[in-house]
């Protein structure tokens, strides 16, 4: 088999097989089972990496205006850009690195994204993964969180920032961007040792996953 990363490709040239190569390959002999697991019983599992809750829906506010209703982040970004007279990211435009360092002479703006996080359990050691962290400030339950990058998640453009421990209940995470047309708010990710229950667009943090059923 072959492993492909994003945007990888493989070109194959096929040639007619010789008669000897066309013979069927005998199937391997059946070996003994390595382990036997009853499908009805829970199986202990250990996650290879932290679990994740996707933060793709947020209330949003441009320049401290009243909060808009919860919306998918890219759609919220389109709404704000349309009001500012900027090109929408859903349209065709140059990739961000093409305009890196370009001064468009825009007025200064802020764009705040508020996430309502509901947890059924106490959580410690959680992190927030986000893009453009150098333009962001973070608060959790009204208290400032140092935007100190301590690693990355999945892709090096997704910086991770440690969040404070929190108890079971409802919490508010607000990410405020120094907003300009070259800053591109994207989905964020809450990662840590917890489970996630999802129903439609609503998710809650639950007990960490320790067992699974087949």
Per-region residue spans from a language model:
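Short strand-edge motifs at loop-to-beta-strand transitions and within beta-strands
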Residues: 10, 109-113, 157-161
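Non-catalytic, beta-strand-enriched accessory regions in extracellular/secretory proteins
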Residues: 102-118
């Amino acid at each position: 088999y072959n492993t492909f990363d994003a945007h990888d490709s493989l070109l194959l040239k096929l040639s007619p097989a010789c008669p000897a190569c066309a013979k069927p390959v005998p199937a391997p002999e059946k070996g003994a089972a390595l382990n036997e697991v009853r499908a009805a019983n829970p199986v202990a599992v250990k996650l290879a990496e932290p679990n994740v809750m996707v933060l793709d829906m947020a209330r949003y506010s441009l320049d401290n205006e009243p909060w808009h209703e919860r919306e998918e982040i890219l759609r919220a970004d389109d709404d704000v850009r349309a009001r500012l007279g900027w090109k929408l990211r859903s349209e065709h435009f140059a990739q961000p690195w093409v305009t890196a360092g370009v001064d468009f002479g825009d007025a200064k703006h802020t764009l705040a994204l508020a996430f309502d996080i509901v947890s059924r359990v106490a959580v410690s050691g959680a992190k927030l993964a986000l893009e453009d962290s150098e333009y962001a400030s973070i608060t959790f339950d009204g208290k400032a969180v140092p935007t100190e990058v301590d690693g990355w998640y999945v892709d090096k453009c997704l910086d991770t920032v440690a969040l404070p421990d929190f108890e079971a209940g409802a919490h508010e995470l607000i990410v405020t961007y120094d907003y300009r047309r070259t800053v591109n708010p994207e989905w964020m990710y809450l990662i840590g040792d917890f489970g996630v229950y999802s129903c439609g667009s609503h998710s809650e943090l639950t007990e960490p996953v320790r067992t699974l059923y087949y």
